[in-house]
Amino acid sequence: MRPLMLQGHERSITQIKYNREGDLLFSCSKDQKPNVWYSLNGERLGTYDGHQGAVWCLDVDWESRKLITGAGDMTTKLWDVEYGTIIASIPTKSSVRTSNFSFSGNQAAYSTDKAMGQNCELFIIDVRNADSTLADQTPTLRIPMTESKITSMQWGPLDETIITGHDNGNIAIWDVRKGQKVVDSGSDHAAGINDMQLSKDGTMFVTASRDTTAKLFDSESLMCLKTYKTERPVNSAAISPILDHVVLGGGQDAMEVTTTSTKAGKFDSRFFHLIYEEEFARLKGHFGPINSLAFHPDGKSYASGGEDGFVRVQTFDSTYFENIFE
């Protein structure tokens, strides 16, 4: 299993994402410039130049035409994927922490941080005929978060709901049409949720939390189905599209990291069985915590982005697919 090392960022990676076909891999980091890579050979196809602060989140739409990014410069930007030009730049009152396109690609949602006297807010915008006037248009929906700020977010099925993960460990489902909370999970996690990723069919999702666990939830009822336990904070988790596997990545906070930690196996990608909750493999590689993980849509490889500024693409050996639990 020989990894591809993608070196194009000067600072730590914040999020990575594949497009629907899996031929493109998008990455963003604290160095202000999101990148796009050809996932097969690791060739960098280009950068999206325009942000003035750390880029915290990104998402690409179903057709790989538009890219949305959110950053610490208090803007969320909509980009043309092919040409790298800014379609629209929407100012916000605090840093943008999460951003996602809906399944249809007609709408996008983004959330802002609770900072500088501003409450966390969730915005939904119409991006069907997006142009530079989008910055002046009123969002389709604006939901203020009075309790804990949003740290991760996903669209529910049929663009009807949004699932949000919060800094206090709560998960909630919001009705997009009414702007109201439909389901609240209560505190399934004891600490903040760092990441949330849907399964291929959207019926369940996995969360990664600072409380050292990752959990599998039902997308409609928010019932906790499985728990994957580790010893350190989990920064990211992803579900395999073809096998009953979950991959977890994390490590201590960046400020607590020492160079000796790599030997202790604190920064490995850890593979768990989706149903049996058992860890069956670890992969080394990063010199620091893993901040983001993503499975390739065909399930034959996965990518990880770390605090060391590298994106690593690992292709699985044939033995990985023959590993049957007994």
Curated annotation (Swiss-Prot):
It is found in: Cytoplasm. Keywords: Cytoplasm, Initiation factor, Protein biosynthesis, Repeat, WD repeat. InterPro entries: eIF3i, WD40/YVTN_repeat-like_dom_sf, WD40_repeat_CS, WD40_repeat_dom_sf, WD40_rpt. WD repeats lie at residues 8-47, 50-89, 145-184, 188-227, 285-326. It holds the Pfam family EIF3I. Its main location: cytoplasm. The keyword Protein biosynthesis applies. GO terms for cellular component: eukaryotic 43S preinitiation complex; eukaryotic 48S preinitiation complex; eukaryotic translation initiation factor 3 complex, eIF3m. GO terms for biological process: formation of cytoplasmic translation initiation complex. One of its GO terms (molecular function) is translation initiation factor activity. Belongs to the eIF-3 subunit I family. Component of the eukaryotic translation initiation factor 3 (eIF-3) complex, which is involved in protein synthesis of a specialized repertoire of mRNAs and, together with other initiation factors, stimulates binding of mRNA and methionyl-tRNAi to the 40S ribosome. The eIF-3 complex specifically targets and initiates translation of a subset of mRNAs involved in cell proliferation. PANTHER family: EUKARYOTIC TRANSLATION INITIATION FACTOR 3 SUBUNIT I. Component of the eukaryotic translation initiation factor 3 (eIF-3) complex. The eIF-3 complex interacts with pix. This is Eukaryotic translation initiation factor 3 subunit I. It comes from Drosophila persimilis.
